[in-house]
Structures are given as structure tokens and as C-alpha cells.
Amino acid sequence: MKKELVFIIDFGGQYSQLIARRVRENNVYCEIIPYSTSIEKIKEKNPKGIIFSGGPNSVYGENSPRISKEIFEIDVPVLGICYGQQLASFILGGKVESAKVREYGKTAVNLDNKCALFEGIDKVQECWMSHTDYVSEIPSGFNIVAYTDGCKVAAMANEDKKIYGVQFHPEVEHTPFGKKMLKNFLFNICELKGDWSVTSFAEEKIKEIRELVGDKKVICALSGGVDSSVAAVIVHKAIGDQLTCIFVDHGLLRKDEGDQVESIFKEKFQMNLIRVNAQDRFLGKLKGVTEPERKRKIIGEEFIRVFEEEANKLGKIDYLVQGTIYPDVVESGTDTSATIKSHHNVGGLPEDIEFELIEPLRELFKDEVRRVGEELGIPHKLVWRQPFPGPGLGIRVLGEVTEEKLEIVREADAIFREEIANAGLDEKIWQYFACLPNIRSVGVMGDERTYSHTIGLRAVNSSDGMTSDWAKIPYEVLDKVSIRIVNEVKGVNRIVYDITSKPPSTIEWE
């Protein structure tokens, strides 16, 4: 069955993937496409709705992202968000100006709830604004359907042509009515049915991989984390023994993790699994390296090189499976947004890679990946395993990575995870881990002065990895963790707890 499709046209907005997630929550399939996509290609896919993302540019900028006016002539409902509204107004003959004072943060907005976009929503609401430019004059055929004290065109609509624009961000949690507004756009305006689900996604992906691969051989970059595990199971269901899973034990894993991975995939899933012990090789390459981006690149490149060597032993291999997911992609930047940090799944690949990539989860958020995993029958414990970056403890040891430092952070992390589980918080907190900042401090232990390592504890709550809040762990739990680490882990005399959210911080320290 052909699924309904909504296109999100990306103009460089930091929330483009979040818009996609909000659409998917309504069981509507969507794809994010660059603003440079031709109108012909858009028409070919027959979308039922189009959403313009926000973006950091001004419509008057020399190199600002644009789109052809034809997009409004293909008889498909359009919703422009922030820069998307400004661009729609600009293209259709309205005026956009730069404000004297930037409007940023929570703002009261007055809505015309006779407009289909705001149907069933109370007239006075709170929304999230983040803009400098604004629509000062709407195009012919449009009406103003929302305003704030600082923005006279907080939303505009041409209901006959089903073209809408909002200056605020309906996709973020800070706009409480945003989900209802997007639902109105999808179901009342675009008249969608909501026929997409993770079950249908998995079925289609298995079929797609089977057709793509044919009788060729595939290897999978298996780490034992949720993403690579679900990716491996999807591909295994598609092609069976044509898949060989290569588990590179780079010595940067959590305590006992290597043995657990080997046991689960060999015994539970009966997969072809090769475990490669490459700790000395990775630590050798990382010796003396302190810059985080360089560490990521080294780990990513060495990871692939190990794969190439194993592939040569197996004969002709055509495809490599990776567990890349949406937040991996957005954190590595796009054509229209600045790079935050290169992600191990997308930024560390050498240019001369010898395999074609299969990334079955590239379009999914973490919560969707977990749901797919459960649909595929992967054990609950594995599906809800803590997110763990590909570079592993290599980026949780800040500065140079050594065997001694790895052992310290590995033991501290195991204690932290154990106490979180003992407190019944292991499935209530989205992600939690210990890291080793490149800091030593003075302490007193056994009446003697010490000058030892500091351990940083990080725990956050999130549903998709795009944004997160620091977790409010009970003091008594933190106290127990601190006492145990200082007493049980040699070389540590101080524990700190990270209380910053994302943004401004990323979840990992490096």
C-alpha cells in the first residue's frame, strides 16, 4: 500500500527534525528534503502536504535559501514556520522587514480560531518565538490570523489556496498548542488519514533491503547499542546468513559489555558474529591525541579500517550496515546549518570507504527505534539499553585516552548505573553515565593529602535526543553513588553532577 507523504523542506532550521518527529507522532510519514530539490522531483513523489522549516537567514540575504514560486501552484497545502512564513510572504508579494528588537522566548499570542489551522484552540495562548525579521505586509489573498504585542503577523492564511504561515515554532514544547495546530494542518487541511506506523516501517524496510541486496554479502557494524542492534536485526530478517556482524571491541566499551554483546547475538539471534579484539590498535592511534573532533575521526576511521580487513578475509563484501539515526545526522550539520559536532556514524567515514552503506534507521528518532526493536522481538532489556556513542568511552575520557583512565571511568560508570537501577530509575531516566574530565583536584583521604581525578556524572531526560533536560536524581541516590565511587575506584577523590540541559550543552561532554 502506498503511504501518504508530507515533505518538510529544510531551510537550515535547527528544529527541522523535530518538526518531522511531531508529524510522525500522528502516524503520518514525512521526509525532510533540501530546499534545492526541484519542483519536478517534489511532484513525482505526490506529497499530500508541505512544511517549510525555519532557518537562520534573512530572505533578503544574497545567499539565503529560496524555493521556486511553483511550489504554491501544485495544489498541495503549505505551512511555513518562522523563516518559512517570511519566505512564503516574500515569494508571494508580501513584505518582510528586520525588527528593531529581536523577539525571543515565550510570548502571548492571540489566535483567530475560526481559521482551520487553529480550530478547537482557545484564542489566547503561549508560543515560542525566535526571530529578528518579520512579515510587515501580507500577500494579496491572505488574512492575519494571529498576532502578538511585538509581531502583528504572528500567523497568516490563504484558506482558499490552503497556504499558511506562522512566525512562532509550533514544534517545540514551549508552544503548548503546537501539537494540536499541526494535527489540524495534517488532518483537517491536508485531509490525511495517518496510515504510517513503526510496524509498516519495519516491514517496508526489510522488503527494501532484500530487494537492494539480492544475493550479495553484507557486514554490520555491531556495537551492541540499541541503534546498531535494531539495524542488525532488520537486515538479518531481510537476508539471513548473507549478513555477517563484525563486533569491533576497541577497548572503549563499558564494563563487561563485550561479553554480553557476543552472548546475545550468537545465542539469541543465531547471527554470524566475528569479535575482533582491537584495543591495543585503537589506544595506539589515540596516544597523545586530546582534541575531541580528532579523537572521533580517528576512532571512526580505524573502525572502518578494521572492517575492511575483516571483509577481505570473508571474500567479496558489498554493503556495510550502520545504525545511524536522525539526531546523528542533524548534529553533524547540513548544507544550511552549522556543524555542532561530527557524529561517529557520519563524520568519521574515510573518503575511500570500500563498501556501500545501508542505514535502515537513518530516518528514525531514538524512541521510534526502540518501538521498531520491540516489534522485531528484540529483548526488552536490550531495546531499552542506555544510548552509547560509537567512540564509546573514548569521548567520555576528556583529553588523552589511556588504559588507566578507561579503567577509572569504566568502574565509576558501572557503579552509577548499578545505583540508578537499584533506585528503580533505570527506565525513568533517558540517559545517564560517568565521564572523566581532564581535571585533578586536592582532597584528603585517610589523613593524607590526595591529588586525584574528578568524575563527572551526567543524567538527562529526553525522548529524541534533539533536546534534553538534566535529570533531578534524588540527593540520597547521588550521595550513595558518590560515596561508592570515591571508596571503590582508585584514583578518584571528587564527584560532580552536571546540571545543564541541551541546549546549551550537548549530552556528551565531548
UniProtKB/Swiss-Prot annotation:
<dbReference type="InterPro" id="IPR014729">
    <property type="entry name" value="Rossmann-like_a/b/a_fold"/>
</dbReference>
<keyword id="KW-0436">Ligase</keyword>
<keyword id="KW-0547">Nucleotide-binding</keyword>
<keyword id="KW-0658">Purine biosynthesis</keyword>
<keyword id="KW-0332">GMP biosynthesis</keyword>
<comment type="function">
    <text>Catalyzes the synthesis of GMP from XMP.</text>
</comment>
<dbReference type="InterPro" id="IPR001674">
    <property type="entry name" value="GMP_synth_C"/>
</dbReference>
<dbReference type="InterPro" id="IPR029062">
    <property type="entry name" value="Class_I_gatase-like"/>
</dbReference>
<dbReference type="GO" id="GO:0005829">
    <property type="term" value="C:cytosol"/>
</dbReference>
<dbReference type="Pfam" id="PF00117">
    <property type="entry name" value="GATase"/>
</dbReference>
<dbReference type="InterPro" id="IPR017926">
    <property type="entry name" value="GATASE"/>
</dbReference>
<dbReference type="InterPro" id="IPR004739">
    <property type="entry name" value="GMP_synth_GATase"/>
</dbReference>
<keyword id="KW-0067">ATP-binding</keyword>
<keyword id="KW-0315">Glutamine amidotransferase</keyword>
<dbReference type="GO" id="GO:0005524">
    <property type="term" value="F:ATP binding"/>
</dbReference>
<protein>
    <recommendedName>
        <fullName>GMP synthase [glutamine-hydrolyzing]</fullName>
        <ecNumber>6.3.5.2</ecNumber>
    </recommendedName>
</protein>
<feature type="domain" description="GMPS ATP-PPase">
    <location>
        <begin position="196"/>
        <end position="385"/>
    </location>
</feature>
<dbReference type="GO" id="GO:0003921">
    <property type="term" value="F:GMP synthase activity"/>
</dbReference>
<dbReference type="Pfam" id="PF02540">
    <property type="entry name" value="NAD_synthase"/>
</dbReference>
<feature type="binding site">
    <location>
        <begin position="223"/>
        <end position="229"/>
    </location>
    <ligand>
        <name>ATP</name>
    </ligand>
</feature>
<dbReference type="InterPro" id="IPR025777">
    <property type="entry name" value="GMPS_ATP_PPase_dom"/>
</dbReference>
<comment type="pathway">
    <text>Purine metabolism; GMP biosynthesis; GMP from XMP (L-Gln route): step 1/1.</text>
</comment>
<feature type="active site">
    <location>
        <position position="171"/>
    </location>
</feature>
<dbReference type="Pfam" id="PF00958">
    <property type="entry name" value="GMP_synt_C"/>
</dbReference>
<comment type="subunit">
    <text>Homodimer.</text>
</comment>
<feature type="active site" description="Nucleophile">
    <location>
        <position position="82"/>
    </location>
</feature>
<dbReference type="InterPro" id="IPR022955">
    <property type="entry name" value="GMP_synthase"/>
</dbReference>
<feature type="domain" description="Glutamine amidotransferase type-1">
    <location>
        <begin position="5"/>
        <end position="195"/>
    </location>
</feature>
<feature type="active site">
    <location>
        <position position="169"/>
    </location>
</feature>
<dbReference type="InterPro" id="IPR022310">
    <property type="entry name" value="NAD/GMP_synthase"/>
</dbReference>
